[in-house]
Structures are given as structure tokens and as C-alpha cells.
A protein has these predicted regions:
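Single conserved hydrophobic/aromatic residue that forms the stacking wall/gate
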Residues: 1-11
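Internal gly/pro-rich beta-alpha loop/helix module
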Residues: 16-88
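Accessory alpha-helical/coil subdomains and C-terminal extensions
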Residues: 61-145, 229
Length: 229
């Protein structure tokens, strides 16, 4: 849609906001957040920073922000990085700059890319349930820096051999997924098998990134560079 194409446009400032307390609750934050979002969107310093999320006097990059509490007004946080800036009484303060972004001209995205989260005692049962003929890609939410049980790692080989891209993120709230351990199922072995290690994103956003890449026609080394960049 034209709306989705506009998000993140270098010439437009896109700011998302909302409320954690409805208008009939004491201390409703909706109107204040709306005003803050307008201030951010109208500030020249907000140009070319991608899609922003403004809540509770903080400015976050939509790429990294996540909800951390069910009801708290300060629920939206950016793990590891922190916010890009703050809403002050008289001005908008940015103390970080957004990194350059790759943009694709896509009308829509489609494809089957499920998310599987690792757990103690996991074997190959979940991957066995997948229809490999319909599968476009897979996101693995791994332990720690990027490790999964041995049996699961062995089963991933069948996907990789069929050319199905597998991307890995950490289950941890903070930190970066990276290959550290060399045992069967460890990150080093997974990377050698062809698993992509996605930095800084959670599983849901890694899924969207992989879908965007596949719909943009990225394959092989170009796909790896984009997913791990």
C-alpha cells in the first residue's frame, strides 16, 4: 500500500505513538504522547531517522523498540541500545543517530516464515511438523548467544540443504547473537552450516526482515549480508 511504502521515506518523518492508559483512566497518557509525537515529527532533527516511536517522553527507533511490560506507561524500551532521544520541556534532544537503512520498493510482502523458540529438552519434533515444500524461511530463537539442542541442529541441516534460509536470534532480552561455542548445536557449528546470525533484532522483527529480503529477491551472499548487517 502507499502507506507502507511511505514508512521510513527519507523525505517524510513517520512517528508512531499511542497510550497505555485510556482516556477514562486517571493519568491517561494519550493526549500527552500525541503532542510529543507532533513535536518530534515537526522537528528538523527528526529527518532521515527512519520510523520513530514516541512514548513516555522517549524517542525510539521502531526497528529496535519492544514492549517490556503489560501495562506500565514506560513499557516501550530499546534493549541494549536505549532510546535515540528524549522529549524535553522546550526542545527535542537526540543523543544518537540512526544507522543507514537499506530500502526496497515493495507493494506487499508474502511468504511462510515461522518462528521456533528453543527450550530445554527440545529435539526435532517442531521442525518435523513443518511442510518444507511450503516453507520460505525459518527464524530460530536460540539460547544465550546463539545455541540450540544437538537434535534440533541436526534437523536444521535438512532445511539448509534444500536452500531454505534459517536465521537465528537470541531469546535473551539484551545482548547480541553471535557464534561462540563450537559443540554440536553451538553457534560456531550453526554458522558453518549456513545459519544467519541476526544482530540486535528480536524474533518478530527478524522474521519481517527475512520476509522483506526474500520478497526483494535477495539470495545467496546478498541475503546473508543483508540479514547479518
Amino acid at each position: 500500500s502507499s502507506t507502507s511504502r511511505g514508512l521510513g521515506d527519507v523525505y517524510k518523518r513517520q512517528v508512531l505513538t499511542g497510550a497505555m492508559r485510556s482516556s477514562n483512566e486517571l493519568g491517561s497518557d494519550g493526549v500527552y504522547n500525541y503532542l510529543s509525537a507532533l513535536r518530534v515529527a515537526s522537528d528538523d532533527k527528526s529527518a532521515d531517522k527512519g520510523v520513530l516511536v514516541v512514548m513516555n517522553d522517549e524517542i525510539h527507533a521502531a526497528k529496535y523498540v519492544t514492549k517490556t511490560h503489560t501495562t506500565n506507561v514506560g513499557t516501550f524500551q530499546t534493549p541494549t541500545h536505549g532510546p535515540l532521544g528524549l522529549i524535553m520541556k522546550q526542545e527535542i534532544l537526540y543523543f544518537k543517530t540512526a544507522e543507514p537503512r537499506v530500502r526496497f520498493d515493495l507493494d506487499h510482502i508474502q511468504g511462510l516464515v515461522p518462528i521456533i523458540s528453543a527450550y530445554a529438552g527440545m529435539t526435532d519434533e517442531l521442525i518435523d511438523m513443518l511442510d518444507l515444500e511450503q516453507l520460505d524461511g525459518l527464524i530460530i530463537q536460540a539460547f544465550g548467544a546463539g545455541n540450540i539442542p544437538k537434535e534440533t541442529a541436526e534437523k536444521l541441516e535438512s532445511l539448509l540443504q534444500k536452500g531454505i534460509p534459517v536465521a537465528l536470534v537470541s531469546r535473551c532480552f539484551n545482548g547480541i547473537a553471535e557464534p561462540v561455542y563450537a559443540y554440536q548445536g553451538g553457534g560456531v557449528q550453526l554458522q558453518k552450516s549456513g545459519v544467519f546470525f541476526v544482530k540486535e533484532l528480536n524474533a518478530q522483527k527478524a522474521r519481517l526482515k527475512l520476509l522483506i529480503a526474500l520478497n526483494a529477491g535477495l539470495r545467496g551472499q546478498a541475503l546473508k549480508d543483508y540479514m547479518e548487517g
